[in-house]
């Protein structure tokens, strides 16, 4: 078996919602089953000029028996803007708020035919609103989501992947 290798690169960007931001992505790729489906662990973190913070990590495993699993974990503290509900909001309706989000996903699937996998997943997301404008729409506790909340669920899934390499494919679906 080949040895694994580290990959890493800086992240720099600009969007109107974030301003300038920067951080890094780092990963370890272990080609236990060759180049087609290497197992890996990837992580990213960045910070923006608008005090937004995001961290994420995804360990992903491919086994010889056709099992594929991953655990996705993320954290965000992401000051943002809220305008209201519906298409008739105005720019003056804008109010600032800061949510904090922790989320995760657990996925497991097995290959039933070459390239075809079926399985299940569980997702969890907890959001807390840390800051909101005094007297704004989000101060109204009757507005769904104005205090945050938890979403959680399980589901079935299927995937079809015949790529010759999941990171840099030249053929397949």
Q: What feature does the model see in each segment?
A:
Residues 2-8, 13-150:
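Gram-negative/organellar outer-membrane beta-barrel architecture
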Residues 1-2, 165:
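Short boundary motifs at domain starts and secondary-structure transition points
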Residues 149-173:
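Loop-centered beta-sheet repeat module
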